[in-house]
Amino acid sequence: MNSYLLAFKSGFGFLSTIPVGITMEGIDELMKKIFFYPVVGAVLGLLIGIVAYAGQLVFPGPVLAALIMGFVYYITGFNHLDGVTDMGDGFMAHGSLEKKVKALKDTTLGTGGVAFGILVLLAFYGSIRSVQEEGIAAFGSNLPFLMFASMFIAEVSAKQSMLTIAAFGKPLPRLKEQTYPGLGEMTINGATRKNFLIGFIFGAVVCCLPFGLIGLIPYLAACISALVLLNRSYAHFGGLNGDGIGTANEIGRITALIVIAVTLKLSLNGYLGGLEWTLL
């Protein structure tokens, strides 16, 4: 199989629950061509967006928000959310850097992890509902399209957030008994400046398709959220691992949706100047 096709296919095996099959050879190719992260995000975003569009025609807002969340985790899995809970345990641990790293890598779930997981899920739900509520006034009968485009942009932004935090991060030191790199370290090593730039440009272009330049606002905000998370990971752990990269995915998605909702509100109040919403 062509190396690019293998990397693209492996992206779905690595970033989603779609049963395409995945091998170590495929993972190696994906890490060499990690710019496929936002490409895979675009495909997943289309699927999620279609569900959001159809659901907006049928279900009440709160029900649809819950259904969208369910479909997102059905198609992407809970691995990234597991990273959120691990990061929460590490953030809440007291003591030295070593103790924090130990809590981060501990397989048991603590209070900090539970709290962080709940907060992220609540924020995800709230961000979807905010887009719905603010979008009614701005888009009216075109609200289903807004939901489609918002979920599409959010998923592309989530995957680019993973690429962003990996591109600017450095891996945590390996454990003494670990002789091979983990998936987090492999991701960081693969996120070269060239791969980051290719992925970033692709993501920026596709996020502009539904809304014009306004589509860049949530995309850039998600990337910035990844850098903020990286700063906190350095402060608490002295580096970055796969849990931090997975957390960037969840935070990036939520950040994009929140910024879309805020942008809608500001545009309705006339605070966006010459920027106008455009429909694909």
From Swiss-Prot:
<feature type="transmembrane region" description="Helical">
    <location>
        <begin position="197"/>
        <end position="217"/>
    </location>
</feature>
<feature type="transmembrane region" description="Helical">
    <location>
        <begin position="108"/>
        <end position="128"/>
    </location>
</feature>
<keyword id="KW-1133">Transmembrane helix</keyword>
<comment type="function">
    <text>Joins adenosylcobinamide-GDP and alpha-ribazole to generate adenosylcobalamin (Ado-cobalamin). Also synthesizes adenosylcobalamin 5'-phosphate from adenosylcobinamide-GDP and alpha-ribazole 5'-phosphate.</text>
</comment>
<feature type="transmembrane region" description="Helical">
    <location>
        <begin position="4"/>
        <end position="24"/>
    </location>
</feature>
<dbReference type="Pfam" id="PF02654">
    <property type="entry name" value="CobS"/>
</dbReference>
<keyword id="KW-0460">Magnesium</keyword>
<keyword id="KW-0808">Transferase</keyword>
<feature type="transmembrane region" description="Helical">
    <location>
        <begin position="254"/>
        <end position="274"/>
    </location>
</feature>
<protein>
    <recommendedName>
        <fullName>Adenosylcobinamide-GDP ribazoletransferase</fullName>
        <ecNumber>2.7.8.26</ecNumber>
    </recommendedName>
</protein>
<dbReference type="GO" id="GO:0008818">
    <property type="term" value="F:cobalamin 5'-phosphate synthase activity"/>
</dbReference>
<keyword id="KW-0812">Transmembrane</keyword>
<feature type="transmembrane region" description="Helical">
    <location>
        <begin position="34"/>
        <end position="54"/>
    </location>
</feature>
<keyword id="KW-0169">Cobalamin biosynthesis</keyword>
<dbReference type="GO" id="GO:0005886">
    <property type="term" value="C:plasma membrane"/>
</dbReference>
<keyword id="KW-1003">Cell membrane</keyword>
<dbReference type="GO" id="GO:0009236">
    <property type="term" value="P:cobalamin biosynthetic process"/>
</dbReference>
<dbReference type="GO" id="GO:0051073">
    <property type="term" value="F:adenosylcobinamide-GDP ribazoletransferase activity"/>
</dbReference>
<dbReference type="InterPro" id="IPR003805">
    <property type="entry name" value="CobS"/>
</dbReference>
<keyword id="KW-0472">Membrane</keyword>
<comment type="pathway">
    <text>Cofactor biosynthesis; adenosylcobalamin biosynthesis; adenosylcobalamin from cob(II)yrinate a,c-diamide: step 7/7.</text>
</comment>
<feature type="transmembrane region" description="Helical">
    <location>
        <begin position="136"/>
        <end position="156"/>
    </location>
</feature>
<comment type="similarity">
    <text>Belongs to the CobS family.</text>
</comment>
<feature type="transmembrane region" description="Helical">
    <location>
        <begin position="58"/>
        <end position="78"/>
    </location>
</feature>
